A protein has these predicted regions:
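Conserved ATP-dependent adenylate/AMP-binding module captured primarily in the ANL superfamily
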Residues: 3, 14, 18-49, 122-141
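Hydrophobic/aromatic ligand-binding patch that stacks against planar heteroaromatic rings
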Residues: 5, 28, 148-151
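Conserved AMP-binding/adenylation subdomain of ANL enzymes
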Residues: 11-12, 122-139, 145-166
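Conserved pre-ATP/AMP-binding loop-to-beta segment of ANL
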Residues: 80-103, 110, 120, 133-139
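Short, acidic/turn-prone active-site loops that include or flank metal/cofactor-
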Residues: 12, 18-21, 59-65, 163-166
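ANL superfamily adenylate-forming
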Residues: 36, 42-95
Length: 166
């Protein structure tokens, strides 16, 4: 849900996962210089100790002690609780606007950030919808990580088994 909210806002998401290792994650995040890092407590602990840039926000509710320990300024949960009263309309991002930075595996050298535009992500979504006949209300059980992310974007009711996507 957070990824889709960021894309709708026009925020550029940077996806770097643990498969890069601490050295690779540090290189990726320092290179991307994000304004915010949203993560689970283990990722936030790494962000604090490795001096990753960006304001730290927890993906899980934390108590006050945990927030201070991790240097967290809030949680996604707290923001969602504050804004339950209504919706906010944002202008749609331009099709050519940057949407995401996804990192290569690093199997042939250091992982590299690949920038995708709003148009490219929409094109991938539309190609999969057309190829597999997805429409709003379709059902999807995703065993392949990219399809797990695309399911909700396709309007499909999605179930994703617990899996390690790295």
């Amino acid at each position: 849900t957070l990824i889709y909210a960021c894309l709708k806002l026009g925020a550029v998401i940077v996806v770097a996962d643990t498969g890069l290792g601490l050295k690779g994650l540090t290189r990726a995040l320092k290179g991307a210089n994000p304004q915010f890092i949203v993560g689970i407590p283990a990722a936030l602990a790494a962000a604090r100790s490795l001096l990753w840039p960006g304001q730290r926000i927890s993906a899980e509710p934390l108590n006050a002690f945990q927030e201070r320990l991790l240097g967290v300024s809030g949680s996604v949960f707290a923001v969602a609780q504050k804004n339950q009263t209504g919706t906010v309309d944002f202008p749609a991002p331009a099709p050519g606007a940057d949407a995401a930075v996804l990192y290569t595996s690093g199997s042939t050298g250091p992982a590299k950030g690949v920038v995708y535009t709003q148009r490219q992500l929409a094109g991938m979504r539309d190609a999969i919808a057309h190829t597999y006949g997805f429409e709003e209300g379709s059902a999807l059980v995703a065993g392949f990580a990219p399809f797990a992310l695309l399911g909700p974007a396709l309007g499909a009711t999605s179930v994703t088994p617990k899996m390690d996507v790295t």
